[in-house]
Design a protein with these regions (language model features):
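Beta-rich accessory regions
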Residues: 23-207
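Beta-propeller blade termini and top-face loops
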Residues: 15-19
Length: 207
């Protein structure tokens, strides 16, 4: 698909349509194409329906433009974390499957923290993390988090509140090739992206 604004830039796009399917006429009346994932390492998604009614999606977490085998490994690429998907107001909502919570340990929680300038939070470190942060207030224009930072490498998450744009920058994540590292997406308002959840894993970071 041809790129439009911030949409459809990864070259191997996975898209979805929301509409009505007429079984009798065998006709689907869909709306506009929507991005399923804004990253470059997301390909060939598939879904399955669990007995409890949840629809689960998983995809190949690899890019055709960044094919390489991590040192000491015998494999190339990996699968994404399974996601629970649902529809809300005509948009697909994606969340990590709840079963992952069984593996959580060493929880660290901070509340009502005022962040000004650079800030590191004690007890939050490592290469495998499940991170949730809630951004509140309206006296800031830009919020940045550096993930998996060490030895000169990091991945940067940015929320531009004034322009309603989120950005993931992997320029300094340690790629062996000069590939597309910055991905951006628009959000409708600051309120609709106040709760940010992400997972950092050493192998996922390498991809």
């Amino acid at each position: 698909m041809k790129a439009e604004g911030y949409e459809f830039h990864n070259g191997n796009n996975s898209i979805y349509f929301v509409g009505e399917f007429d079984k009798g006429e065998k006709k689907f009346d869909g709306g506009e194409p929507l991005s399923l994932d804004y990253g470059t390492d997301f390909y060939a998604p598939q879904t399955t329906l669990l007995p409890d009614g949840r629809r689960i999606m998983i995809a190949w977490m690899q890019s055709w433009h960044n094919l390489w085998i991590p040192g000491g490994q015998k494999w190339q690429g990996m699968m994404t974390i399974p996601r629970e998907i649902s529809l809300k107001n005509g948009r697909l909502i994606q969340k990590p499957v709840r079963e992952i919570e069984k593996y959580h340990a060493n929880m660290v929680r901070y509340s009502d923290e005022v962040v000004s300038g650079r800030r590191s939070l004690e007890g939050i470190s490592g290469r495998s993390l499940d991170v949730t942060f809630v951004i509140t207030g309206n006296k800031y224009s830009r919020f940045t988090v550096n993930l998996a930072k060490g030895s000169g490498y990091y991945t940067r998450f940015i929320y531009d509140r004034e322009n309603n744009i989120i950005e993931m920058d992997r320029t300094f994540a340690g790629f062996e090739k000069d590939v597309v590292c910055i991905r951006r997406a628009c959000v409708k308002s600051a309120e609709c992206y106040g709760d940010v959840k992400g997972k950092v894993d050493e192998q996922q970071e390498a991809q």
